[in-house]
Amino acid sequence: MQRITPLLLILVSFSAIASNNPPNALFGYKESPRSNLGLFPQWLSVLERHIVEMTPEGQCDAMEFNRCHMREWQSFLRSIRHMDADTQIRMVNGYANKKEYVLDIENYGINDYWASPRQFLHNNGDCEDYAIIKMMSLKQLGFNKDKMRVVVVQDTNQRIAHAVMSIDRNNDILILDNQVEEVISHRDIFHYVPVYSVNEDSWWMHLPNGRE
């Protein structure tokens, strides 16, 4: 993910409505919930493809739908199913972060493409692809999908768009970031400005609220 798309202009248009909402904890920003996921065709495409691609088809030497990549992932998830929730979160973060970072332009010939877990396991990927497979992994382990989001942010240090995964956990919001080895609290991050976040049912726009 190299830039914030024109969708940002749509999000900003809702600012007057969102500013009346109570403050949200994520990075100390307010948020405005929405249900129209049609604004996010790439995200909807990921959800649809993931359902189809979870079917164990294809050969182990296939270039695209390689069932062995899925088998390895599923084996990993089974191996940590007995662990406590916090350990599972750390293990999932580490598992995904071992994959090589590859720009969408190199993988798919376009500047921004949201890959399904199966595509990420085969092709590697960029920031949102790490976030997506982490979310799908934790969902499969039994975590509540309503507590997790893919969060698109502006990295004010590098001045680029970025994406991470967030999960509500024990009165905190934990951030799983491909740029950071450890799982950390959102309270300890000050260089990310959240733009929007999505899960399977809703999306949110984020607006400044001030931080303590």
Regions found by a protein language model. Give the residues of each.
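N-terminal signal peptide c-region/cleavage motif recognized by signal peptidases
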Residues: 13-15
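Sec-dependent signal peptide recognition
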Residues: 2-9
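A structural boundary/capping signal
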Residues: 18-212
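Residue-level detector of alpha-helical hydrophobic segments embedded in or interacting with membranes
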Residues: 1, 17-18
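Short, linear, compositionally biased motifs with a strong N-terminal bias
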Residues: 10-11, 142
